[in-house]
């Protein structure tokens, strides 16, 4: 949320840094002004996905000496790290801010777009992804980071999101 208005300032000459990743910290926290039970695994995955979309520095806030397998799985996601480290260096911009979800779009150096659909609600949600919801979006080729496979998308994709889930897609054909 804090990075949303800063996209024009982020890039190869300077990176917007919203602080450290909370993936794997676990346990109770008072950092939000009241005691909470911490994040679920799905929330950690969403946090990391959005962080990567922002091209933010990947600084771990957890104890890296004692990471469990699920934390490692999140933090070592090659596809998300590739989006974060894309040489174009652009930060994602919020394309849609609806009542309970966001759509973020990050241009990539090869001409494709990384698109993140994030459910901010504590209830499941289905959103439609197409050229009306994201300007100039090509669905000619769509790679889902969630399923690690190509999606069949004629004119749209119906994105089913669990509470607080973020799904990321790479859309379009790479430019040669």
Where are these regions (language model features)?
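Solvent-exposed beta-hairpin/edge-strand motifs
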Residues: 132-147
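Catalytic cores of secreted or luminal carbohydrate-active enzymes
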Residues: 46-95
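Flexible loop/turn segments at secondary-structure boundaries
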Residues: 29-30, 60-61, 67-70, 122-125, ...
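C-terminal beta-strand-rich structural cap/linker in extracellular carbohydrate-active enzymes
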Residues: 152-176
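Glycan-recognition surfaces
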Residues: 1-62
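Generic recognition of flexible, low-complexity loop/linker segments
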Residues: 37-40, 101-105, 156-157
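Short, glycine-/Ser/Thr-/acidic-enriched flexible segments
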Residues: 28, 58, 65, 88, ...
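Carbohydrate-binding surface patches
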Residues: 51-54, 59-61, 97-134, 164
